[in-house]
Amino acid sequence: MTKYSSLSGIFSRKWIFIRGIPTIHFLPPEGPPEIAFAGRSNVGKSSLINALVQQKSLARTSNTPGRTQELNYFVPDGFSGEPGNLPPIALVDMPGYGFAEAPKNLVDAWTHLIFSYLRGRTTLKRVYVLIDSRHGIKKNDGDVLDLLDKAAVSYQIVLTKSDKTKSNELAKLIMITKTKLLKHPAAYPELLVTSSEKALGLEELRAAILQAIAV
């Protein structure tokens, strides 16, 4: 039994937002294992995090692409954060990428923050890269996957909004995506298929997260 074997109910607890990180200099000291969520703007990161912990408004959702401009940290409530009473896990909502209409200086700032975090965080156990099941992997997604490979950061693809895709199209996308991942050495081979709106694939995602932090 690992130290994380008893955490199966952790996603039923109340979770809280603890801080937003606008630049790499504001990162908290490395402590509990971190699980990060990356994806294009409006791919559904905030909605998926809310569904994951069964809270409607933990992570802010917005119809405005690029609203999330910081690394947003969430932890289960009831831990002081002091040595000896650290939370067992932290979830990190990363700034969305691929928003072409954002000012270049903002895009550059977000890019630097994301890349610096990925390269230098030893407590980062896995990045879940969210891909809209209606569109598949786009160039911006591919660039992020290449970066994760170079940084040797373990990541796993999560297809979102699967309820909005016909079953035959979804099956085809899964096959195409798995084939593309064969060229990415840091990619976890298993795809996760989810829908925040229909609560599909959430148990599988929770189990994958617990497995990732136990490694």
Curated annotation (Swiss-Prot):
Requisite cofactors: Mg(2+)
Residues spanning the signal sequence: none
Keywords from the UniProt entry: Cell cycle, Cell division, GTP-binding, Magnesium, Metal-binding, Nucleotide-binding, Septation
Binding-site positions, GTP: 39-46, 66-70, 93-96, 160-163, 194-196
An example Gene Ontology molecular-function term: GTP binding
EngB-type G domain location: 31-215
Short name of one Pfam family: MMR_HSR1
GO biological process: division septum assembly
InterPro entries: G_ENGB_dom, GTP-bd, GTP-bd_ribosome_bio_YsxC, P-loop_NTPase
Family matches, as SUPFAM superfamilies: P-loop containing nucleoside triphosphate hydrolases
Family assignment from sequence similarity: Belongs to the TRAFAC class TrmE-Era-EngA-EngB-Septin-like GTPase superfamily. EngB GTPase family.
NCBIfam families: GTPase_YsxC
Entries under HAMAP family matching the protein: GTPase_EngB
Name this protein carries in UniProt: Probable GTP-binding protein EngB
Organism for this UniProt entry: Bartonella quintana (strain Toulouse)
